[in-house]
A protein has these predicted regions:
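Boundary at the C-terminal end of the N-terminal hydrophobic targeting segment
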Residues: 35-42
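Gram-negative and organellar
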Residues: 42, 46, 53, 89, ...
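Bacterial N-terminal signal peptides
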Residues: 22-33
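N-terminal secretory signal peptides that target proteins for export/translocation
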Residues: 1-18
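Alpha-helical segment of the N-proximal tetratricopeptide repeat
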Residues: 46-76, 86-93, 120
Length: 545
């Protein structure tokens, strides 16, 4: 029985029901947030553990285990940048370049401003042989963080693999200027120096790289390459050529040279390169237009020695010097110009050059043999004199990229018959294919002038020569095969000769048999619009130990 004073429960109002519903939603949201946080902490903990395990596996070079660990972790935590970044690096280290590049592209689509992953992407491109595509990516990463020396080293390596040795050398040297204890930068500079023909400099840089903890595998490869470059070689060969000595529009002597030679190379104290060559050549010049009892202007036997030293360890400053001696003897007394009392010739060569960023200034001097057909002042008889051509030149080369090269030269030459020549020239080349075989086109323009004409050698006055060429060259590691071919068209105008246009082709092939027997062949041939033909062949073989 209900008391009159006891009130019955009132039904809930709409406002009260809304408050109850909001409270319930708050409890549910808080529970879900706590559950998500707990799950995130668990996922983060698992991701961190996966990173630790994968890094340890990578340190052991167990890249397959590292990759599988990271892939499992990414299934539970697909947005984790650290997991994805390490996976991209592991795939690159294990040479799965396509997968690595795809992973990096996913990363950079999410985080385009990440310099670290941008550099990793560039590195994977370079390692996979796409150095051309890697270079702009490296530049973007460096623009985002120029203090990362590892990125700049990767950039320099990509430049070198792309053929831009000038740019690579300059970048490695900038890294070394920032940190002289960076072993990998010294190692990269060592490789570039060797590719520029300076193995003694590479040897010095490699030792610095080793002292500063450079990559051991890279050190081993560079040391093996230097050891191969230092191996002494000795060999023999044969050369033959036919040239034209044009002295007027109606006179073109035929100059022929044939004979064997022996040569050798060695490195003294891992510091100075040395080369020597001894040859025994037959030289003669024919005047086919003379209706006399002989068409020989001269007929000589030459015994020649040449020795050269190069001083390349002080890279980027380089120097070389050499001396040559020739002894002549007459082979045939029935000649128009018999050999006189002077039977010896001494020549020399010297060059100094340096790599200054993308510029290469140079200076040089040479003295080369040239046969002078003269008249004896005392007797009035014809006589052949072993004359000399002494030249000095200044040059400047510019390598703005892997594709483009330009150079210019100023030279002054003096002949023993009181003649002189001044020449100014320049050329430019463009490499339109950098894969093997490499293809390049070039164009050169040269102006020159002699003090006077000569009956002994070609003396075009106030001449302008245009030359355009196409060159193909390549290298194959199998058999250390080095090959190339070139075609050139040249056109020359002068004040004392009719216009001359010449087509010239040349080829070379060098290889190594059984790892220690280098063999080589070189040949060229030309024909001009006056039907004058020239050719030359050189065969060589040597042993390396």
């Amino acid at each position: 029985m209900t008391s009159d004073t006891q009130q019955a429960p009132k039904p809930a109002t709409p406002r009260r029901r809304a408050h109850l519903f909001a409270s319930l939603l708050g409890v549910v949201f808080l529970s879900m947030t706590l559950a998500a946080a707990t799950s995130a902490r668990g996922a983060t903990s698992k991701s961190e553990e996966a990173l630790r395990v994968a890094r340890a596996a990578s340190d052991r070079k167990d890249f397959d285990h590292a990759a599988s660990t990271l892939r499992r972790a990414l299934k539970a935590d697909p947005e984790n940048q650290d997991l994805l970044s390490l996976l991209a690096r592991v795939l690159a280290w294990s040479r799965h370049f396509d997968e690595s590049i795809a992973t990096y592209r996913t990363l950079l689509a999410r985080h385009p401003g990440d310099a670290f992953d941008r550099a990793g992407y560039a590195r994977a491109l370079a390692w996979s042989g796409h150095s051309k595509e890697a270079i702009p990516e490296f530049r973007r990463a460096i623009a985002q963080d120029s203090t990362d020396l590892e990125t700049r080293i990767g950039y320099a390596r990509a430049l070198s693999w792309d053929g831009d040795l000038a740019g690579a050398s300059a970048e490695f040297r900038r890294v070394i200027a920032a940190d002289r204890r960076n072993g990998d930068a010294w190692l990269g500079l060592a490789t570039v120096a060797r590719w520029r023909g300076a193995p003694t400099a590479s040897d010095a840089f490699t030792e610095r790289a080793a002292a500063h903890g450079a990559d051991k595998e890279g050190l081993g490869e560079e040391r093996n390459a230097v050891r191969l470059a230092f191996q002494p070689t000795a060999g023999a060969g044969w050369t033959g050529s036919r040239e034209r000595q044009i002295t007027s529009d109606s006179t073109a002597f035929r100059l022929e040279t044939v004979g064997p030679f022996v040569d050798g190379r060695a490195t003294l104290g891992r510091t100075v390169g040395m080369a020597a060559r001894v040859s025994r050549l037959h030289l003669w010049e024919i005047n086919p237009g003379l209706p006399t009892d002989t068409t020989l202007n001269y007929d000589l036997r030459s015994t020649a020695f040449r020795g050269d030293l190069n001083f390349l360890r002080s890279y980027p400053v380089q120097a070389s010097a050499g001396i040559a001696y020739q002894r002549f003897e007459a082979r045939n007394s029935t000649v128009l110009y018999p050999l006189g009392s002077d039977k010896d010739f001494v020549g020399f060569n010297a060059r100094l050059w340096g790599y200054a960023g993308r510029l290469t200034p140079s200076a040089g001097a040479t003295r080369d043999f040239i046969a002078i057909k003269a008249t004896d002042a005392a007797t009035g008889a014809r006589v052949l004199v072993p004359g000399g051509l002494t030249s000095a030149d200044l040059g400047l080369r510019w390598d703005p990229s892997a594709r483009v090269t330009a150079s210019g030269t100023l030279a002054r030459s003096f002949y023993t018959d009181d003649n002189a020549r001044t020449s100014v020239g320049g050329d430019a080349a463009y490499r339109f294919r950098r894969a093997e075989p490499r293809l390049a086109v070039d164009y050169g323009l040269t102006w020159s002038n002699f003090s006077k004409t000569s009956t002994s050698y070609f003396t075009p006055l106030q001449s302008v020569r245009h030359a355009a060429g196409l060159t193909a060259a390549g290298y194959s590691e199998r058999g250390a095969l080095d090959y190339g071919a070139r075609y050139e068209y040249a056109f020359m105008q002068s004040g004392n000769f009719a216009d001359i246009s010449t087509n010239t082709g040349s080829v070379y092939l060098n290889g190594t048999v059984l790892g220690s027997l280098p063999l080589g062949v070189e040949a060229y041939g030309s024909v001009d619009n006056h039907s004058y033909r020239t050719w030359g062949v050189t065969l060589s073989g040597s042993v390396r130990w």
